[in-house]
């Protein structure tokens, strides 16, 4: 997972909602899930089942595959605190993982080319080792 969202709880996505001109959590969740989420679904809490289906951190279990993570510390699109939900889920379920931080990168990992090279090399090792 490279710069990808770990969870889609709408409260965490205010910047993206603003950028995409989404006025409500229902609009955001409808866009992310492909399901027509209404304000009533949100108020009832039923929206959680849809968020559960698309949020990597919520899908992790003891049978999850080893995971390689990389996040840019200057990412303006994916809230960086979300990575902790995924890391915690992996640790709580005993899933092997490696984590890379790209200190100079935003959503694309092109400002830390040495780190990107290490990440890509390890991704090939993951393919050989686990798949």
Regions found by a protein language model. Name each.
Residues 5, 74-75, 106:
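Catalytic metal-binding/acid-base residues of hydrolase active sites
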Residues 10-14, 80-81:
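Short, solvent-exposed loop/turn and secondary-structure capping segments
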Residues 12-59:
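Mobile cap/lid helix-loop segments that gate and shape the active-site cleft of serine hydrolases
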Residues 63, 68-71, 75:
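Short beta-strand/loop motif that positions the catalytic acidic residue
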């Amino acid at each position: 997972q490279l710069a990808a969202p770990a969870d889609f709880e709408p409260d965490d996505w205010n910047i993206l909602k603003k950028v995409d001109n989404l006025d409500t959590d229902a609009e955001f969740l409808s866009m992310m899930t492909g399901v027509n989420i209404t304000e009533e679904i949100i108020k009832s809490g039923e929206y959680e089942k849809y968020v559960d289906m698309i949020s990597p951190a919520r899908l992790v279990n003891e049978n999850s595959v080893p995971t390689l993570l990389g996040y840019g510390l200057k990412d303006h699109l994916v809230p960086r605190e979300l990575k902790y939900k995924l890391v915690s889920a992996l640790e709580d379920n005993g899933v092997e993982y490696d984590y890379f931080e790209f200190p100079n990168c935003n959503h694309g990992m092109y400002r830390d080319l040495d780190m990107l090279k290490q990440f890509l090399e390890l991704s090939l090792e993951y393919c050989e080792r686990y798949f």
